[in-house]
Amino acid sequence: MIPMQFALRRRMIIAGGGGAPISDLPLGTLIRILYSDGGKGVADYEIADINNLVSGGVVLVRKNIHSNSAFGSTDSYPNGTLDNLINTTIYNNMPQKLRDKMMDVTFGLLTVSGIEDITRKMFALTRTMAGFGGSEGKALQLYTSDASRVKTFNGSASNWRLSSQHIADGGVWVVQTDGSATNYSSSSSYGVVPAFVIPSETPYDPTPNTDGSYNLIL
C-alpha cells in the first residue's frame, strides 16, 4: 500500500503542483499555523469538522490551550473578554493570507430570552459544537467522546472555556480535564481554545512536519 503522504504528493503533481484540498485529510489531522503565539511562533490546529457546521468549510480547532482568560463581566459571550481576545487579539496574530481565507460563521447562543445569532471569523466552541447537545450550532464531527475533548496547557490537562451560558444553574460552560463539562463562574480564568473555518478546497502541502502536522498553502 502506498503511504498517504506519497499518494497525496502524487495527486498534487497530477493536479499541477497546487496541493491537495484540506478536506481530503481525516478528522483529527493537525494543521500547523505559523503566527505570533506567545513567542513560540507556531501552533497546531486539529481538523474537527468537514462540510458540516459550514457547507464547503473545514473547522480547525486549536489542539491545545492558547492561554487562560476570564469569560467576561457577565455570562454573555458577545463582546465579552473571551470573545474579544479570540476575535480580535488572536485573530490579528494570524497571517494575513489565512485571515483572508477565514469564513464568516453564524451560530446561535442560548440566552434567557432564547437563541441569539452571532457571526464571527474566530470563536470559542459552543457546548453543541463540543458534543454536549443543545441547539447552538451543530455538533462537530471530531468530538464524540470525553477523551476527544481533553486539552492541555503547558503539558497538563486543563479546563477550557466554551461560549455557552449555563442557563439552568448560572455561569458558563467549561470543558473539564477529563473531557466532561460543567458550569463555572464567568470571572474565573480557564483555557482559551480558538476555532475558525476555512474553505474545504484550501490546499495543503502533503509532506508532513516532524510532529505529523501539515502546512497550508496560502
Predicted regions and their residues:
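N-terminal low-complexity, intrinsically disordered "leader/linker" segments enriched in small/polar
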Residues: 1-18
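Collagenous Gly-X-Y triple-helix signature in extracellular proteins
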Residues: 16-218
